[in-house]
Amino acid sequence: MKLLHISDLHIGKRIYGYDLEDDQRFILKEIIDIINDEKPDAVLIAGDIYDRADPSASAVRIFDDFLSMLASTGTESFIIYGNHDSGHRVAYGSRLFDRAGIHFSPVYDREPQCTVLEDEYGPVNIYMLPYLRSVDAEEALGSIEVDKSQRNVIVSHQFVTSAVLGDSEEMNVGTLDNISGSCYSAFDYAALGHIHMPQTIARSRADADSTSDPEDSKEEAAGQCVIRYSGSPLAYSFSESDRIHKSVTIVQLKEKGSVEVQTIDLSPLHKMRTIKGTFSDLIKDEGLVEKCRKDYIKVILTDDAGVMDAMNRLQKVFDNVMTLEYEYMRQQAEEVLIEEIHTEGAPGDLFESFYEEQHPGKEMSGYQKDLMDKVIRKIWEGQEACDEAD
């Protein structure tokens, strides 16, 4: 049985104020083309359909168009909600969608949904478990009665311990949101979402785990549960853009215990690139300008001082400069933060020191200090309210 696995669409997401609707429509159409070419028996979409629990009308239209194209392929599809989604919104109309072969995980009610598909090797049980808090996810996974003599697949949206994170994932402090890969040991393949870097975590029945290189294009596992993050179809941070190939995951299930994983690379409408150099060198480099003109750009200037109106001038050369940083300011900020954190100063003192390092010979005004104090108080009040709610 051939499965196509994707996740973390984050429809409606913006980066540095840039609307990505055209990029998302483009990549979703590319995924539909791959589905038509590969003809999988099922498509697995492992959560974070939207970037917000209350998606915009335009984001909903994009997903609606994608679902229409998906239904037209005639492929059975299994979709769960992630931590960015509202379960009620994503599951709306699910009984009608079932008739078109598109199956949404309902709002979790302690009973993970299971659908049985058949091929020449027998049944494949496909379970859907939407995003849950780690303690609830572990309980839910432990309660599923799995027939281990058959092939079992689960679509899930969790953070498995030892997964490699990128900058675009939201991280919880510590390991409170982690679950062990051993929770998936009853399954042959775990189609996961939540982590944006594609990677495979192979978990043996004996509970020995390893994390593969995210760049691996083909892995095989026999007698193991293969835990796989397909990754997001688009790069949502510059740290992902230069070293990670975005892809869809193709899974081949043959006889019990035989799982083969391959990837098909995706080509985005706009690449995300980081370019670095002096202002003068960057705008005069004709080869660089030609190569990057249409891309989404992060510029790191290595000039010793600020350049007048640098952002506007760069945007006249490169169409989509998203953000601009100065290397010397980053280095100064890092040095200040490291030094001051070691002294365990109060937040206000740390901020004043940071300000003075960035503006040599100039102190914060009384108004700025008052404003800073108000912001710090609001942060602490919000934290205390969260602690009381917990």
Q: What spans do the regions from the language model cover?
A:
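N-terminal active-site segment of His-dependent metallophosphoesterases
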Residues: 1-66, 154, 369, 373-378, ...
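Binuclear metal-dependent phosphoesterase catalytic core
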Residues: 111-120, 206-220, 229-295
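Glycine-rich phosphate-binding loop signature in dinucleotide/nucleotide-binding domains
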Residues: 35-39, 120, 146-149, 291-292
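Short, surface-exposed amphipathic charged segments that create phosphate/polyanion-binding patches used
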Residues: 117-125, 244, 335-345
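Divalent metal-coordination and catalytic microenvironments
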Residues: 8, 28, 48, 63, ...
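General small-molecule cofactor/ligand-binding pocket signal
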Residues: 4, 103-105, 127, 228, ...
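His/Asp/Glu-rich metal-coordinating catalytic cores
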Residues: 55-56, 62, 68, 72-226
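Accessory, non-catalytic peripheral segments of nucleic-acid enzymes
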Residues: 37, 42, 252-390
